Amino acid sequence: MNLMATLLTNTMLTSLMVLIAFWLPQTYTYSEKTSPYECGFDPMGSARLPFSMKFFLVAITFLLFDLEIALLLPLPWAIQANNTNLTLLMSFMLIILLAIGLAYEWLQKGLEWTK
């Protein structure tokens, strides 16, 4: 019964907020607010604009390193486990691998898209 009351309350509150959002007037409707923004590019222009391949490679490299760093996020909870030596060793090895990958990208000039 308690679950049903909670679900009913949540549904009613959500419906009430949606109805209020539809009834409230849209003030300050500027053309800049209603037009789409595409990272500085004109969204209504040609889709065949030249694109820097070096910038694309830097963006992909950033995504890879960002995802690998995300593997370290559960580390504070993993340290509380019984076998902390193995956890710290594996996380240290991951950091070393990331540093080697970053050094390789730097030496290969993969982080420069201006040239």
Swiss-Prot record:
**Compartment(s):** Mitochondrion inner membrane
Q: Name one GO biological process term.
A: mitochondrial electron transport, NADH to ubiquinone
Its primary localisation, in coarse terms, equals mitochondrion
**One Pfam assignment:** Oxidored_q4
**Which InterPro entries did the record assign?**
NADH_UbQ/plastoQ_OxRdtase_su3, NDAH_ubi_oxred_su3_sf
Q: Might you give the EC number(s) for this enzyme?
A: 7.1.1.2
TM annotation in the entry: 3-23, 55-75, 86-106
The superkingdom of the source organism is Eukaryota
User: What GO cellular-component annotations does this UniProt entry give?
Assistant: mitochondrial inner membrane; NADH dehydrogenase complex
Question: Which Gene Ontology molecular-function terms are recorded?
Answer: NADH dehydrogenase (ubiquinone) activity
Topology within the bilayer = Multi-pass membrane protein
Which UniProt keywords are present, listed alphabetically?
Electron transport, Extinct organism protein, Membrane, Mitochondrion, Mitochondrion inner membrane, NAD, Respiratory chain, Translocase, Transmembrane, Transmembrane helix, Transport, Ubiquinone
Give the reactions, separated by semicolons, that this protein catalyses.
a ubiquinone + NADH + 5 H(+)(in) = a ubiquinol + NAD(+) + 4 H(+)(out)
| Subunit annotation | Core subunit of respiratory chain NADH dehydrogenase (Complex I) which is composed of 45 different subunits. Interacts with TMEM186. Interacts with TMEM242.
Q: What is stated as this protein's family in its record?
A: Belongs to the complex I subunit 3 family.
Function of the molecule: Core subunit of the mitochondrial membrane respiratory chain NADH dehydrogenase (Complex I) which catalyzes electron transfer from NADH through the respiratory chain, using ubiquinone as an electron acceptor. Essential for the catalytic activity of complex I.
Which protein, by its recorded name, is this?
Answer: NADH-ubiquinone oxidoreductase chain 3
Q: Which organism is it from?
A: Mammuthus primigenius
